[in-house]
Amino acid sequence: DFCLSRGLGDVYKRQLLSRLADRNTRGYTYAVPLVQGGVFVGATPELLVRRIGNRVVVNPLAGSAARSADPARDRTIAQTLMASDKDRREHAVVIDEVARALRPLCRTLDVPPTPEVVATDALWHLSTTLVGELADARTTSLDLALALHPTPAVCGYPTARAHEAIGELEPFARGYFAGFVGWCNVQGDGEWAVALRCAEIHDTAVRLYAGAGVVPGSVPASETAETATKFRTMLSALGLGSSVD
């Protein structure tokens, strides 16, 4: 949490959104006016679900590593992430649960056996794209988003126990963070992304949100560093540098 020297006018809000889009070309940039005033804004790399006609696409990301400006070092980081037993286990939990949620809703579902490594500007991620065909054409993109959310990537697993633990252990309310943002039209088509790397802005008050998954084998210092890297998305767009003290 911090305060700006002055509130964000409409022009600056548009500039902020433009900066986020320019610097995060591989994901989804969003800004949602809040009923209580202010705006919820961010840039997320993660597609929760897309539904166009009977085709369903889901692309969970789980398992991450900060990139390097040195090309050789950057390639090594990507290879190390792909070979990481801890990160592969974290990713598998998410994919298994997402597939379990989708199968009752799909006539067919293709689940690749292994993830791939994809890059954003700041991080490498393990990524798996699941593609299905709807069993019932009346199932909308919003229905699918509600069936999938929250995934283990943002809530943990088993879901009910993890949700209870979050309520007991996290010293703050997540608000809209780790929810989903997107659209659904009258035909049921739509696209929803996981609301990550974001901020709630009310006049001069700003609250940033970012996080990392914790599984057996996680190193607290590494997860803290990963979270700090994710904060850079909003910090740099706000013109506040890229470090978290």
Which role fits each region the language model picked out?
Residues D1, A83, D87, P216-E223:
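Alpha-helix N-cap/helix-initiation motif
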Residues D10-R89, V93, P104-D110, G188-G211:
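An anion-binding catalytic pocket shared by soluble metabolic enzymes
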Residues A135-D245:
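Conserved hydrophobic core element of enzyme catalytic domains
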Residues N59-E168, G239:
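Contiguous alpha-helical scaffold segments within structured protein domains
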Residues D1-Y12:
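Single conserved hydrophobic/aromatic residue that forms the stacking wall/gate
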Residues R6, L34-F40, V98-R100, P115-A122, ...:
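A glycine-rich phosphate-binding loop feature that marks nucleotide/adenosyl-phosphate handling sites
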Residues F2, A101, M234:
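Short alpha-helical functional segments enriched in proximate histidine and acidic residues
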